[in-house]
């Protein structure tokens, strides 16, 4: 396994401080549930992490040797224990700040995808109907 060299803060040209010396990546996972509704997989972040006590997608700092997809999947596996074989990568989107970027990988999951809070970075993980996301 290659060294983890991406953890750390960077002062961004936008004036903000961001986590991830080589940028960061997250994965937005969606699926159609058994009733035909669209769901998104969300993580309730622990209070001590960057942007803590908020709901969002699993993700974090990318290491220097990682592709966007590899970094996003690694973070999701570390935080939620998902099986990457249960994902179909659809696309990705980049929020580029010049000297730092955040990449969102968008993936479709099978109904069998199982996840749980795997480390102390999460209070909770769960599937949420698209229409219910703003209520969290």
Residue ranges and their predicted role:
Residues 35-79:
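Conserved Nudix-box catalytic region and its N-terminal flanking loop in Nudix hydrolases
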Residues 19-22, 35, 50, 97-100, ...:
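A generic fold-level signal
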Residues 1-34:
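Acidic, metal-coordinating catalytic segment for phosphate/diphosphate chemistry
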Residues 19-20, 54, 125:
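A residue-level structural signature of the nucleotidyltransferase/glycosyltransferase Rossmann-like core
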Residues 29-31, 42, 107, 127:
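Conserved hydrophobic "DFG−1" position in protein kinase catalytic cores
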Residues 24, 33, 46-47, 61, ...:
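Short, flexible active-site-adjacent loop segments at beta-strand->alpha-helix junctions, enriched
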Residues 60-136:
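Unchanged
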């Amino acid at each position: 396994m290659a060294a983890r060299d991406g953890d750390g803060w960077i002062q961004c040209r936008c004036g903000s401080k961001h986590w991830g010396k080589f940028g960061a990546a997250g994965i937005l996972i969606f699926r159609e549930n058994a009733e035909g509704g669209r769901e998104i997989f969300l993580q309730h972040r622990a209070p001590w992490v960057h942007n803590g006590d908020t709901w969002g997608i699993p993700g974090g700092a990318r290491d220097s040797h990682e592709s966007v997809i590899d970094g996003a999947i690694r973070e999701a596996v570390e935080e939620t224990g998902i099986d990457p074989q249960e994902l179909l990568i659809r696309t990705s989107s980049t929020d580029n700040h010049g000297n730092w970027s955040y990449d969102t990988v968008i993936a479709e999951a099978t109904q069998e995808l199982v996840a749980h809070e795997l480390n102390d970075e999460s209070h909770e993980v769960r599937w949420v109907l698209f229409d219910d996301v703003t209520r969290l």
